[in-house]
A protein has these predicted regions:
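Surface-exposed aromatic
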Residues: 86-101
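Short acidic amphipathic segments
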Residues: 113-124
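Bacterial N-terminal signal peptides that target proteins for export
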Residues: 1-8
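Extracytoplasmic
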Residues: 53-55, 91-94, 117-118
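N-terminal secretory signal peptides
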Residues: 20-78
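Helix N-cap motif at beta-to-alpha junctions
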Residues: 65, 102-108
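C-terminal motif of bacterial Sec signal peptides marking the signal peptidase cleavage site
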Residues: 15-18
Protein backbone atom coordinates (compact mmCIF):
# COMPACT_ATOMS: atom_id res chain seq x y z
CA UNK A 1 0.00 0.00 0.00
CA UNK A 2 2.84 2.40 0.85
CA UNK A 3 4.36 1.70 -2.57
CA UNK A 4 1.15 2.87 -4.27
CA UNK A 5 1.13 6.13 -2.28
CA UNK A 6 4.80 6.76 -3.03
CA UNK A 7 4.23 6.11 -6.73
CA UNK A 8 1.18 8.38 -6.78
CA UNK A 9 3.08 11.13 -4.97
CA UNK A 10 5.96 10.82 -7.43
CA UNK A 11 3.63 11.05 -10.44
CA UNK A 12 1.86 14.05 -8.92
CA UNK A 13 5.20 15.75 -8.31
CA UNK A 14 6.28 15.16 -11.93
CA UNK A 15 2.98 16.54 -13.18
CA UNK A 16 3.28 19.67 -11.04
CA UNK A 17 6.88 20.27 -12.10
CA UNK A 18 5.99 19.92 -15.77
CA UNK A 19 3.36 22.64 -15.36
CA UNK A 20 5.83 25.17 -13.97
CA UNK A 21 6.57 28.01 -16.34
CA UNK A 22 10.05 29.47 -15.89
CA UNK A 23 10.58 32.70 -17.79
CA UNK A 24 14.06 32.00 -19.13
CA UNK A 25 13.51 34.39 -22.03
CA UNK A 26 12.79 37.25 -19.61
CA UNK A 27 15.87 36.38 -17.59
CA UNK A 28 18.00 36.34 -20.74
CA UNK A 29 16.60 39.73 -21.74
CA UNK A 30 17.37 41.14 -18.30
CA UNK A 31 20.93 39.75 -18.45
CA UNK A 32 21.46 41.78 -21.66
CA UNK A 33 21.38 44.88 -19.45
CA UNK A 34 24.74 43.81 -18.00
CA UNK A 35 27.38 45.31 -20.27
CA UNK A 36 30.40 43.86 -18.48
CA UNK A 37 32.75 41.17 -19.78
CA UNK A 38 32.81 38.64 -16.95
CA UNK A 39 34.62 35.93 -18.90
CA UNK A 40 37.93 36.60 -17.15
CA UNK A 41 36.49 37.19 -13.66
CA UNK A 42 37.10 34.30 -11.25
CA UNK A 43 34.71 32.84 -8.66
CA UNK A 44 35.92 35.37 -6.09
CA UNK A 45 34.95 38.25 -8.37
CA UNK A 46 38.54 39.12 -9.24
CA UNK A 47 40.46 39.34 -12.51
CA UNK A 48 44.04 39.87 -13.56
CA UNK A 49 47.36 38.12 -12.97
CA UNK A 50 47.80 35.93 -9.90
CA UNK A 51 49.98 38.54 -8.21
CA UNK A 52 47.69 41.48 -8.99
CA UNK A 53 44.04 40.45 -9.03
CA UNK A 54 41.47 43.22 -8.72
CA UNK A 55 37.70 43.42 -8.39
CA UNK A 56 35.54 44.80 -11.18
CA UNK A 57 33.48 47.85 -10.25
CA UNK A 58 30.19 48.47 -12.03
CA UNK A 59 27.71 51.31 -12.15
CA UNK A 60 24.02 51.81 -12.80
CA UNK A 61 21.38 54.34 -11.89
CA UNK A 62 18.09 54.10 -10.02
CA UNK A 63 15.32 56.51 -9.08
CA UNK A 64 16.63 58.57 -6.17
CA UNK A 65 14.23 57.42 -3.45
CA UNK A 66 14.79 55.70 -0.10
CA UNK A 67 12.66 52.76 -1.28
CA UNK A 68 14.74 52.15 -4.39
CA UNK A 69 17.98 52.46 -2.43
CA UNK A 70 16.72 49.95 0.15
CA UNK A 71 15.73 47.47 -2.56
CA UNK A 72 19.15 47.72 -4.21
CA UNK A 73 20.98 47.52 -0.86
CA UNK A 74 19.05 44.33 -0.06
CA UNK A 75 20.48 42.76 -3.23
CA UNK A 76 23.99 44.25 -3.33
CA UNK A 77 25.84 44.78 -0.05
CA UNK A 78 28.76 46.49 -1.85
CA UNK A 79 26.67 49.26 -3.41
CA UNK A 80 27.63 52.88 -2.82
CA UNK A 81 25.11 55.61 -3.61
CA UNK A 82 26.40 58.75 -5.32
CA UNK A 83 23.45 61.15 -5.60
CA UNK A 84 24.20 64.16 -7.78
CA UNK A 85 26.93 62.34 -9.75
CA UNK A 86 26.28 61.33 -13.35
CA UNK A 87 28.96 58.69 -13.84
CA UNK A 88 29.66 57.21 -17.27
CA UNK A 89 26.15 55.74 -17.20
CA UNK A 90 24.72 59.27 -17.32
CA UNK A 91 22.42 59.41 -14.29
CA UNK A 92 19.95 62.22 -14.81
CA UNK A 93 18.13 64.53 -12.41
CA UNK A 94 15.99 62.44 -10.07
CA UNK A 95 18.31 59.45 -10.41
CA UNK A 96 21.04 58.19 -8.12
CA UNK A 97 24.32 56.80 -9.44
CA UNK A 98 25.12 53.43 -7.85
CA UNK A 99 28.53 51.75 -7.81
CA UNK A 100 29.01 48.10 -6.84
CA UNK A 101 31.78 45.52 -6.93
CA UNK A 102 32.19 41.94 -8.06
CA UNK A 103 34.24 41.23 -4.94
CA UNK A 104 31.36 39.58 -3.09
CA UNK A 105 29.82 36.16 -2.76
CA UNK A 106 27.77 35.10 -5.80
CA UNK A 107 28.48 38.30 -7.71
CA UNK A 108 26.82 36.89 -10.85
CA UNK A 109 23.59 36.23 -8.93
CA UNK A 110 23.77 39.79 -7.58
CA UNK A 111 24.16 41.21 -11.09
CA UNK A 112 21.33 39.00 -12.34
CA UNK A 113 19.03 40.19 -9.55
CA UNK A 114 19.90 43.82 -10.21
CA UNK A 115 19.30 43.40 -13.94
CA UNK A 116 15.85 41.97 -13.20
CA UNK A 117 14.79 45.22 -11.52
CA UNK A 118 12.61 47.10 -14.02
CA UNK A 119 14.02 50.51 -13.11
CA UNK A 120 17.63 49.56 -13.89
CA UNK A 121 18.21 50.09 -17.62
CA UNK A 122 21.91 49.19 -17.86
CA UNK A 123 24.83 48.04 -15.74
CA UNK A 124 28.28 48.93 -17.07
CA UNK A 125 31.85 48.69 -15.88
CA UNK A 126 33.00 51.63 -13.76
CA UNK A 127 36.47 53.01 -14.57
CA UNK A 128 36.60 55.87 -12.02
CA UNK A 129 37.69 58.43 -14.59
Amino acid sequence: MTHIYNTAAFILMLFCCSCMNVDTRGQAEAWKKVGIDLSNVDQDGLRGPADGKVAVSYEFCIPDTPEHRAAVRAIDSTVQFMPGSRGRIGASKGQCLCIGSTQQKDYKAVLRSLSNLPYIARIIECYFE
